[in-house]
Regions:
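N-terminal amphipathic/basic leader segments beginning at the initiator methionine
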Residues: 1-19
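Alpha/beta enzyme core
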Residues: 11, 20-29, 35-323
Length: 323
């Protein structure tokens, strides 16, 4: 006698009855690149279908998201001015600060998440302040990050998401938010962020590629898994409310481990390289885009993700409508 597993796979009705992994539009977070300037809608060469928008053109993107039922967005800034100290990152009239104010006034129903990092605002493209040898100075960078987070809070952001990978950033950000009356703003921390080649297209999109060197001294080494739990534990102890796993697809083992050990909300970030590879293969007719994307989304959910940051969010919403 043997177990007949196929009995529960015999028809779509049975498969739908017994499924236990669910995906909803409310699980989707859509990244948006806001470029400083006017009348800008610029497609990103390495990410077909993804654009940079100036604030005066952002309505067309937001209206489409509304119609599709997507209400969570993650903002990245592309400023005109950059310097060694990322001062534009905490400019009260900076591109993201102005975008937050505009969106929250005209589209209050959107959950606006602000990515907190220096790389989009530094002239050298690194995620912090550099010393004379070109190394990122951890504690000096914390001061800048906390200023960026506070400026977002003052502009009306719903969630701050530090992505820099400096030690102690959550504590510093949590302190400055509390001291200024913003203790109710959640911190969605990129607690797990590997030094990955899957980020390539994003760096074109955000104009944030390092001018020299790499980010291996502060982003995590994919050859070592021993620090994953410690990274998350430290961030949670310092005040993080949610954690992001980035990249997601190649690190589902880490995502699962974090969810099992801590039980906190976990966000999977399906990064630009994943998007571009799938798009390129689909454009060439090598894969079925819808099937691949939906399989990927359910994999994130099965591993324990509460939500997914994905450039495919609009497509996924349409697929869900199609059934």
């Amino acid at each position: 006698m043997y177990k007949r597993h196929r009995k529960l796979r015999n028809s779509s009705a049975i498969r739908n009855l017994v499924k236990n992994i669910y995906l909803e539009k409310g699980d989707l977070i859509y990244p948006i690149f806001i470029e400083e300037g006017e009348n800008i809608k610029r497609e990103i060469n390495s990410m077909p279908g993804i654009f940079r928008y100036s604030i005066d053109r952002i309505d067309e993107e937001l209206e489409e998201l509304k119609k599709l039922g997507i209400s969570s967005i993650l903002l990245f800034g592309v400023p005109l001015h950059k310097d060694e100290c990322a001062t534009e990152g905490y400019n009260e009239n900076g591109v993201i600060q102005n975008a937050i104010r505009y969106i929250k006034k005209k589209y209050p129903e959107f959950l606006v998440i602000g990515d907190v990092c220096c790389c989009e605002y530094t002239s050298h493209g690194h995620c912090g302040i550099l010393d004379e040898k070109g190394n990122v100075k951890n504690d000096e960078t914390l001061e800048v990050l906390s200023k960026i987070a506070l400026s977002y809070a003052k502009a009306g952001v719903d969630i701050v998401a530090p992505s820099d990978m400096m030690d102690g950033r959550v504590k510093k950000i949590s302190q400055i938010l509390s001291e200024n009356g913003f203790n109710n703003i959640p911190i969605m921390c990129y607690s797990i962020k590997y030094s990955s080649s899957f980020y390539g297209p994003f760096r074109e999109a955000a104009g944030s590629a390092p001018k020299f060197g790499d980010r291996k001294s502060y982003q995590m080494d994919f050859r070592y898994s021993g620090d994953a739990l410690s990274e998350v534990e430290a961030d949670l102890m310092q005040g993080a409310d949610m954690v992001i796993i980035k990249p997601a697809m190649a690190y589902l083992d880490i995502l699962y481990k974090i969810k099992e050990n801590f039980g906190v909300p976990v966000i999977a970030y399906s990064v630009s390289g994943e998007y571009s590879m799938i798009k390129a293969a689909a454009i060439n007719g090598w894969i079925d885009e819808k099937s691949i994307v939906m399989e990927q989304m359910y994999a994130f959910k099965r591993a324990g993700a509460n939500a997914v940051i994905t450039y495919f969010a609009k497509d996924v919403a349409r697929y869900l409508d199609e059934g």
